């Protein structure tokens, strides 16, 4: 389950628009929004791509954002 609040903070800090991030992931803006809101799950490849784009380098931060309980 994605920690929506933490992910939204990282997106805002990155300066990227959600439409740009969605395009980089091969998703529509709507598809990305559904994943951020936990309506659908991120694929491992999407998580890895977002980590690169959003400069999420620590495994702890990655886990806190994408594998929240």
Which residue ranges define each predicted feature?
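Short alpha-helical "recognition helix" segments of helix-turn-helix
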Residues: 20-22
């Amino acid at each position: 389950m994605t920690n929506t609040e933490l992910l939204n903070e990282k997106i805002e800090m990155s300066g990227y628009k959600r439409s740009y991030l969605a395009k980089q992931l091969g998703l529509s803006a709507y598809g990305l929004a559904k994943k951020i809101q936990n309506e659908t799950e991120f694929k491992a490849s999407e998580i890895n791509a977002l980590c690169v784009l959003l400069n999420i380098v620590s495994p702890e931060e990655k886990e806190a954002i994408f594998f929240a309980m």
